[in-house]
From Swiss-Prot:
This is Deoxyribonuclease gamma. One of its GO terms (cellular component) is endoplasmic reticulum. Liver and spleen. Has DNA hydrolytic activity. Is capable of both single- and double-stranded DNA cleavage, producing DNA fragments with 3'-OH ends. Can cleave chromatin to nucleosomal units and cleaves nucleosomal and liposome-coated DNA. Acts in internucleosomal DNA fragmentation (INDF) during apoptosis and necrosis. The role in apoptosis includes myogenic and neuronal differentiation, and BCR-mediated clonal deletion of self-reactive B cells. Is active on chromatin in apoptotic cell-derived membrane-coated microparticles and thus suppresses anti-DNA autoimmunity. Poly-ADP-ribosylated by PARP1. ADP-ribosylation negatively regulates enzymatic activity during apoptosis. It comes from Homo sapiens (Human). The keyword Calcium applies.
Length: 305
């Protein structure tokens, strides 16, 4: 490569990365009224959301339905270049009186919601597997190499994680019967690590044993804030040749907001006990559409001292 071409190639790669769509998943622990009134925590949450073009927010505990409107006001205030967020939110889900919601916040200029539904968790002979049934959303975007994709979110109960993660294959089958969708993203707080999903349990999880499901966040990652823990609870899994080949190489990662925003562990825990996980989809305007296989990142993050 000539010296003249090298800077141009670097510039094109930089533009390509900037145009890519970042998709994130974030369990904001106990996201209710008290956290909503914590200005410092809310400022960090808004910063995290603004990094993402689509973000799944979990563990919303808001019987008054105020969290998302407040986030919209904060995100869309002084919006630059006409970039505004919208959202779609699930019903309040859970057994007995304990309820949570899933919400997807997204940049309206880049993506729109095609369809959505709540998975009906009452299959013959296998009723009520999920503590919080997936809220399935079909997104479309003219700006990404893959034009539409379904996101299936999940926040498991730790003690039943193995069964719930395995059951996502049934959700996949249900969506395929309903919609002509080919590209799938499964993501959320699967509690898929440490004692909740020991190594010997993986053989009982079809989402892992079927090689057509590609795991972007590996077992070696740490998605927890506490330096005393080291667990890959939060995951992203893909299904579909087109979407797998559209992932920006090495974009699948854990976002350490404590390090990024120079927070103490206590300040970070006021936000959540989980770090977000994320990846990028290539832009349709990219000068090349990489066909490299997605590989799991080697662990580079060390616990903060």
């Amino acid at each position: 490569m000539s010296r003249e071409l090298a800077p141009l190639l670097l510039l094109l790669l930089s533009i390509h990365s900037a145009l890519a769509m970042r998709i994130c998943s974030f369990n904001v622990r106990s996201f209710g009224e008290s956290k909503q009134e914590d200005k410092n925590a809310m400022d960090v949450i808004v910063k995290v959301i603004k990094r993402c073009d689509i973000i799944l927010v979990m563990e919303i505990k808001d019987s008054n339905n105020r969290i998302c409107p407040i986030l919209m006001e904060k995100l869309n205030r002084n919006s630059r270049r006409g970039i505004t967020y919208n959202y779609v939110i699930s019903s309040r889900l859970g057994r007995n009186t304990y309820k949570e919601q899933y919400a997807f916040l997204y940049k309206e200029k880049l993506v729109s919601v095609k369809r959505s539904y709540h998975y009906h968790d009452y299959q013959d002979g296998d009723a009520d597997v999920f503590s919080r049934e997936p809220f399935v959303v079909w997104f479309q975007s003219p700006h990404t190499a893959v034009k539409d994709f379904v996101i299936i979110p999940l926040h498991t109960t730790p003690e039943t994680s193995v069964k719930e993660i395995d059951e996502l294959v049934e959700v996949y089958t249900d969506v395929k019967h309903r919609w002509k969708a080919e590209n799938f993203i499964f993501m959320g707080d699967f509690n898929a690590g440490c004692s909740y999903v020991p190594k010997k349990a993986w053989k009982n999880i079809r989402l892992r044993t079927d090689p057509r499901f590609v795991w972007l966040i590996g077992d070696q990652e740490d998605t927890t804030v506490k330096k005393s823990t080291n667990c890959a609870y939060d995951r992203i899994v893909l299904r579909g040749q087109e979407i797998v080949s559209s992932v920006v190489p090495k974009s699948n990662s854990v976002f350490d907001f404590q390090k990024a925003y120079k927070l103490t562990e206590e300040e970070a825990l006021d936000v959540s006990d989980h770090f977000p996980v994320e990846f990028k989809l290539q832009s349709s305007r990219a000068f090349t559409n990489s066909k490299k296989s997605v590989t799991l990142r080697k662990k580079t993050k060390s616990k903060r001292s």
